[in-house]
């Protein structure tokens, strides 16, 4: 099967000759950038992604949405097309991707990877009829998921129109990353969210210059009408924000957090302004230019893909 593959450059204890073992190459053509805007050219953690549930359709839907969203306040993963051979046998067309990990955070922000924690929603709770999806440890420093769960409980039980309550949340959570995450996913109608596919990271170092939780853009494969049930007629904004008579359209931690935050007028106005302005950033010219470039990268390879995986449509 053409499955996604995680790649680790380890050496002996991730060291070789006293140096950490990395791939030293500008794999993403300058698209992966550090905090100074310089290309990241050294990697110890990578992902060869098959494009998930989109693997039999475009094969790069998530990579495309992440690429055009780069430069916003929510973290994204760079990508490039790759021909994969395993033991000399052609295995297919994949997407080389960065991977959300402590190493990713260190590369992009300069934080010490040994003090970074990455958490994610607990996918095991998704089938609960009334899901209350707790967050669990993902990678890096363990034991911080409950800290974020407690933040959610605070938002649930405190009036965030009260300045001191909102100020506390604002000191713990990168609200700009949350706003841009919501705006991007609504723009692309990227469902299987907000109840799922949520990841955050933070630097736990006591002397960290920024110890807030930061949202990342993760797994948008269902976006742009991939599934018939997620076409343009599906109003993700309504699902995300609607709350009436004590009932959420979709009852999950993120919708409850947004409802609580919108009690603060400044946050609410900022969220609405971003939802309104994002189409100017993601305009048709920008979207078409990036799409044409990514299609041109992959189109010559798709005949090889179809020959290798004839039952997988054109992926």
Task: Identify the residue ranges that each predicted region occupies.
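Middle-to-C-terminal accessory/interaction subdomains
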Residues: 1, 15-19, 54, 71, ...
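Conserved ATP-binding subdomain of kinase catalytic cores across diverse folds
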Residues: 1-131
């Amino acid at each position: 099967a053409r499955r996604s593959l995680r790649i680790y450059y380890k050496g002996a204890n991730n060291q070789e000759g006293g140096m950490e073992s990395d791939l030293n190459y500008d794999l993403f053509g300058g698209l992966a950038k550090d905090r100074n805007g310089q290309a990241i050219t050294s990697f110890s953690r990578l992902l060869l992604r098959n494009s998930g549930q989109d693997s039999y359709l475009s094969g790069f839907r998530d990579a495309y949405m992440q690429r055009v969203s780069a430069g916003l306040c929510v973290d994204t993963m760079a990508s490039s097309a790759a021909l994969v051979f395993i033991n000399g046998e052609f295995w297919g067309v994949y997407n080389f991707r960065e991977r959300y990990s402590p190493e990713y955070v260190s590369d992009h922000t300069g934080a010490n990877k040994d003090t970074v924690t990455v958490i994610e929603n607990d996918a095991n709770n998704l089938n609960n009829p009334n899901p209350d999806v707790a967050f669990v440890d993902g990678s890096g420093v363990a034991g911080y998921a409950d800290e974020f769960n407690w933040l959610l409980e605070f938002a649930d039980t405190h009036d965030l129109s009260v300045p001191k309550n909102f100020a506390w949340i604002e000191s713990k959570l990168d609200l700009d990353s949350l706003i841009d995450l919501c705006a991007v996913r609504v723009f692309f109608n990227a469902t299987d969210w907000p109840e799922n596919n949520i990841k955050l990271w933070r630097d736990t170092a006591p002397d960290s210059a920024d110890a807030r939780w930061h949202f990342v853009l993760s797994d948008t494969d269902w976006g742009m009408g991939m599934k018939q049930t997620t076409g343009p007629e599906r109003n993700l904004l309504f699902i995300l924000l609607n709350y009436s008579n004590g009932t959420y359209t979709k009852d999950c931690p993120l919708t409850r957090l947004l409802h609580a935050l919108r009690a603060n007028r400044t946050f609410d106005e900022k969220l609405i302004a971003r939802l309104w302005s994002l189409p100017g950033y993601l305009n048709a010219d920008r979207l078409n230019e990036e799409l044409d470039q990514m299609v041109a990268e992959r189109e010559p390879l798709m005949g090889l893909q179809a020959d290798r995986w004839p039952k997988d449509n054109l992926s």
